[in-house]
Design a protein with these regions (language model features):
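Conserved, mostly hydrophobic/aromatic
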Residues: 24, 52, 102, 192, ...
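Conserved N-terminal beta1-alpha1 strand-loop-helix module at the mouth
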Residues: 2-51
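Short, well-ordered coil/turn segments that N-cap beta-strands
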Residues: 16-20, 48-51, 77-81, 106-108, ...
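Active-site-adjacent beta->alpha loops and helix N-cap segments on the catalytic face
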Residues: 10, 32-34, 60-72, 91-97, ...
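Short, acidic/polar
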Residues: 31-44, 66, 92-99, 180-191, ...
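Active-site pocket-lining/capping segments in soluble small-molecule metabolic enzymes
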Residues: 3-11, 32, 129-152, 156-163, ...
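Catalytic beta/alpha-barrel core
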Residues: 51-62, 85, 111-113, 198-207, ...
C-alpha cells in the first residue's frame, strides 16, 4: 500500500489532539554503539516526543549504561526521560541508590517493573528484604522521594512544582510469563494504581480491540489512570518472532507470513508503516491518550509510521532545542 493512503492520514491532527507521543530506547551496551545511539535519539527528538523511556536491561545488567544515558538525556536534551527500574537483578539497597541517583540528576518519572528474570532463572524470587513486585517498587520510589523532601525544604518545593510520576506496565492480552488472563491483569493494574501508579504503558498487542476491551474492563472496576498503548513497528519478521518468544504474546501468523513474502526490506518497511499507522488510528479512535513506540534503537520504522499520520520531523530541531508543542 502506498504511503499516501488517505484513509489513515493524520488522525493526530483531528479530534485527537493533543495526543501523547513517546518512544522506548535501549542504552548502548558498548562504546562503538554510542554514536549511532545518539544519532537515533536526535532523529527521534525531531518529531517532538513528550518523553522517552530508557530500559534497564534483563536482570538489571545494563544499569550503569542506563543511568549514564538517562543523565545525558536530562542534561543535554529537551526530552523528559522515563527511567526504567526493575526488581530482578537488584537488591533493595541497589534500587534505593539508583532512585537517589536519578532524582539527584533531575529525573521525575520512573517506569516501575518487576523485570525479566535472568536466563535459566524463570522461577526467580527476591532474596530476603528484596523488592519482589512493581507494587513494592512503587512504594520504595515514593519513600525515597519523601525522605528527600523531608530532609531538604528545597526538594519539597521542587517536588510540588514538578511532582514525581510513576508509570507501570499493563498487559491487555494477559501476561503469559506470569500465567495471567486479561481480567487478572486488570486487577493487578488496580493494585498498582492504589500503590501510587500515575499511568500505565501496555505490553504489545496486534489488534486494537484487545486494547479497547482491556481499557473498558479496567474502567469498570475503577482504574482511572491513563493507559497508553505500547506498539512495535512490524517490519522485521525475525524480530517479531524473537519478541513473541520473549513476551509470549503471539504475533498473528498472517503478519509474519506477509512480511516474509516481501522480497525486499523496502517493501517490508512500507507494509509495516501502513500496518502501524492503521493500528494507531484504531487505538486513538478507541480513546487512547497517545502512543508509546518501541524502537529497538531504530528511528526509521517509527518515523515512517508517524509520517503517514502527518507527524513530520523538524529538520532544524536539535538535541539542544527548547521543548515545544507539536503543531
Amino acid at each position: 500500500m502506498p504511503f499516501s493512503d488517505d484513509a489513515y492520514a493524520c488522525p493526530c491532527t483531528h479530534d485527537h489532539e493533543p495526543t501523547l507521543l513517546s518512544f522506548e530506547v535501549m542504552p548502548p551496551r558498548k562504546p562503538s554503539l554510542e554514536e549511532p545511539f545518539w544519532n537515533t535519539v536526535d532523529q527521534l527528538l525531531r518529531v517532538r516526543p513528550d518523553f522517552m523511556s530508557v530500559t534497564y536491561g534483563a536482570g538489571g545488567k545494563d544499569r550503569s549504561n542506563a543511568r549514564a544515558t538517562v543523565r545525558r538525556l536530562v542534561r543535554d536534551t529537551p526530552i523528559q526521560p522515563i527511567a526504567h527500574l526493575t526488581c530482578v537483578g537488584n537488591s533493595t539497597e541497589e534500587v534505593v541508590s539508583t532512585v537517589y541517583d536519578y532524582l539527584d540528576s533531575g529525573v521525575r518519572t520512573f517506569l516501575a517493573l518487576r523485570g525479566d528474570p535472568p536466563v535459566g532463572q524463570e522461577g526467580w524470587e527476591p532474596g530476603p528484604g528484596g523488592v519482589g513486585s512493581a507494587t513494592e517498587l512503587i512504594h520504595l520510589i515514593r519513600t525515597v522521594e519523601k525522605r528527600r523532601c523531608d530532609a531538604h525544604p528545597g526538594e519539597a518545593l521542587r517536588s510540588a512544582f514538578k511532582p514525581l510520576t510513576i508509570a507501570v506496565a499493563a498487559f491487555p492480552a494477559g501476561n503469559p510469563a506470569a500465567g495471567t488472563t486479561p481480567a487478572q491483569e486488570v486487577e493487578r493494574l488496580l493494585v498498582k494504581q492504589a500503590a501510587g501508579a500515575s499511568f500505565a504503558i501496555t505490553q504489545l498487542f496486534w489488534d486494537a480491540e484487545v486494547y479497547a476491551s482491556f481499557v473498558e474492563r479496567a474502567r469498570r472496576v475503577g482504574v482511572t489512570i491513563p493507559i497508553v498503548p505500547g506498539l512495535l513497528p512490524a517490519t522485521d519478521p525475525a524480530r517479531l518472532r524473537r519478541v513473541q518468544d520473549l513476551t509470549g504474546i503471539e504475533v498473528p501468523e498472517y503478519l509474519l507470513t506477509t512480511l516474509a513474502d516481501y522480497p525486499h526490506q523496502e517493501a517490508r518497511d512500507e507494509f509495516g508503516a501502513v500496518f502501524g499507522s492503521r493500528l494507531i488510528h484504531s487505538v486513538l479512535e478507541a480513546g487512547a491518550p497517545g502512543v508509546h513506540l518501541y524502537t529497538f534503537n531504530r528511528s526509521k520504522p517509527v518515523l515512517d509510521i508517524l509520517a503517514l499520520m502527518g507527524v513530520k520531523p523538524d529538520p532544524l530541531r536539535s538535541q539542544a532545542s527548547s521543548p515545544e508543542t507539536r503543531a
